[in-house]
Amino acid sequence: TLYHLIFIVKIKNIMKVCILGNSLTALTLAKSLVNLKINVEILYIKKNLNLSKTRTIGISKSNIDYFNKKITNINPLLWKLKKIEIFSDNLSREKLVNFEKDNEQIFSIIQNHNLYEILKKELSNNKYCYLKIFNNNDLSSLKSKDLTINCDPQNIITKKYFSKKITKKYNSRAFTTIIKHDKITNNTALQIFTREGPLAFLPISNNETSIVFSLNNYRDHKKINIEQLIKEKNFKYKIKKIDKLQSFDLHSLNLRSYYHDNILAFGDLLHKIHPLAGQGFNMTIRDIKILSNI
């Protein structure tokens, strides 16, 4: 596992760490390290990532506590959920599971772009962090770094050293959007297992809810009106508007090699799972926790 293959080194004694990429994972990792007063150089290909404003992340209570304490306070960005209800395609006639814990917070939803912007702003003003566009001249200097952490699946380092992986394609595609609706007490997440695939309603405020629909057979996507499906399966909200749909392919992967010399693979480059489990970014936070404690 990652924990057993991380370099045998005390990271707090390293003078400088280089992080490749400026994804949400890369910035989260960088912020955790600069908080330990470790000098971090971030090398990236694209200066401005075009982050979808319809993408959201579910974060567990324990990971939120760690994030607030060790990385940055994200409480103002969170929408706390106290219950999860799971239905079959029959909806109210067949509720499969009901998760709740004495009216306490189970997990929280945060919008990707909001979290990204606050991390980017804090790192830009941090004396321990230096951001720079990656070019071929930087390749030779990577070997001189004490530790390089690669979070970018698209760069030349990935293609050269981290191309061997075990991949599972689901022939599925996730569609995301935000619905705007009348104001309600909105602290319950809904998951409906439709015939076409799971449909999630994830509250982000009292009048907005994030939608994630995973289409089981992507070849059939042209036959399905996803906006109509959302309206048909919705039994809770008085919808005013459905934002433009965005989508991405679903697959899982694990690298065969987690590191090369002084370069460590990290985040989605290292391992990726189906978002239905809700563990993608939660796994990343747990990996950051382990790495920071070495």
Predicted regions and their residues:
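Active-site flanking residues adjacent to catalytic metal/cofactor-binding acidic residues
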Residues: 20, 43, 149, 267-268, ...
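Short glycine-rich anion-binding loops that position phosphate/pyrophosphate groups of nucleotides
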Residues: 25, 153-156, 279
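FAD/FMN-dependent oxidoreductases across multiple families
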Residues: 219-293
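Conserved FAD-binding catalytic core of PHBH/FMO-like flavoproteins
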Residues: 151-235, 242-245
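Glycine-rich FAD cofactor-binding loop and adjacent beta-loop-alpha segment at the N-terminus
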Residues: 17-82
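Conserved N-terminal helical subregion
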Residues: 65, 78-175
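N-terminal amphipathic/basic-hydrophobic helices that include classical n-h-c signal peptides
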Residues: 1-14
